[in-house]
Amino acid sequence: MLKSNNASETVTHKVGDKTAKKVFFRRRKGCPLSVHNAPVIDYKNPELLIKFVSEGGRMLPSRITNVCAKKQRKLNNAIKIARILALLPFVFQAK
């Protein structure tokens, strides 16, 4: 039986009548925008913003990008402003 969770992973093996549990904790990586030399979140930087937008044009959630909540809000606002100013497209076209 295999159970997995976002923060930890539990593996259960059946050995005879007893079950043995092994718990593996994956260390969560920190926010890529909170490190020392991180780029500044700005609507005028579409190269940075496009990394946090999916192929369909939707903003990626923080559980996928590992961005902290504070930076995720700043990213969302910057992406919205960049779209309004036509620096980023609202919908990406399939090629």
Curated annotation (Swiss-Prot):
Q: Which GO terms describe its molecular function?
A: small ribosomal subunit rRNA binding; structural constituent of ribosome
Q: Which GO terms describe its biological process?
A: translation
Keyword Ligase belongs to the record: no
Give any Pfam family that matches.
Ribosomal_S18
- What is the protein's given name? Small ribosomal subunit protein bS18
Chain's role = Binds as a heterodimer with protein bS6 to the central domain of the 16S rRNA, where it helps stabilize the platform of the 30S subunit.
Q: Write down the InterPro entries for this protein, in alphabetical order.
A: Ribosomal_bS18, Ribosomal_bS18_CS, Ribosomal_bS18_sf
Q: Which family does it belong to?
A: Belongs to the bacterial ribosomal protein bS18 family.
- Oligomer and partners: Part of the 30S ribosomal subunit. Forms a tight heterodimer with protein bS6.
- Which keywords has UniProt assigned to this entry? Ribonucleoprotein, Ribosomal protein, RNA-binding, rRNA-binding
Gene Ontology CC: one annotated term: cytosolic small ribosomal subunit
